[in-house]
């Protein structure tokens, strides 16, 4: 199991060989100082994981997260910690996990005004075809919010997907928007 260190809202894998291993198993994390490596061999620095990625990898048994006191944070504790740091973590994590289990590569979508950028092949190999916004199925979305989501996805030439999470059934439904000129 790969050793990872919790540092605030990030998790670091200091060992470069272990970083390469984790990255090569699904494009997890970002190598510090290297943008969009095309090959795992390009990983020559420690890997930085988001909390969402870390919770997922801990659940899968691929990483062991250790806090500043040397305590190992198992999946449940790491999930609880992340919930305190990230707004709507439960909704975001449910969507992240669902997309990963469906075989997609899921990265942060913050620069696109979304929760996630989703790839079919991987970063550095293609541009992300989708941006995903995670929403509680019971949450109301105003027409103005919907239009603002659409503007960002349209200007970046990505398909907008709303991921609707039903907390009761823990299911996720997806709605993809296609914008047309009239």
UniProtKB/Swiss-Prot annotation:
- Pfam hit, one: tRNA_int_endo_N
Q: What class of enzyme is it?
A: lyase
- Keyword set includes tRNA processing: yes
Gene Ontology biological process terms from the UniProt entry? tRNA splicing, via endonucleolytic cleavage and ligation
Recorded catalytic reaction(s): these are: pretRNA = a 3'-half-tRNA molecule with a 5'-OH end + a 5'-half-tRNA molecule with a 2',3'-cyclic phosphate end + an intron with a 2',3'-cyclic phosphate and a 5'-hydroxyl terminus
GO MF annotation list: lyase activity; nucleic acid binding; tRNA-intron endonuclease activity
Keywords in alphabetical order: Lyase, tRNA processing
Catalytic residues (UniProt):
119, 127, 158
Family to which the UniProt record says this protein belongs: Belongs to the tRNA-intron endonuclease family. Archaeal short subfamily.
Q: What does this protein do?
A: Endonuclease that removes tRNA introns. Cleaves pre-tRNA at the 5'- and 3'-splice sites to release the intron. The products are an intron and two tRNA half-molecules bearing 2',3' cyclic phosphate and 5'-OH termini. Recognizes a pseudosymmetric substrate in which 2 bulged loops of 3 bases are separated by a stem of 4 bp.
Family annotation (PANTHER family): TRNA-SPLICING ENDONUCLEASE SUBUNIT SEN2 (PTHR21227:SF0)
* Protein name stated in the entry: tRNA-splicing endonuclease
* Source species: Saccharolobus islandicus (strain L.S.2.15 / Lassen #1)
Organism lineage string: Archaea, Thermoproteota, Thermoprotei, Sulfolobales, Sulfolobaceae
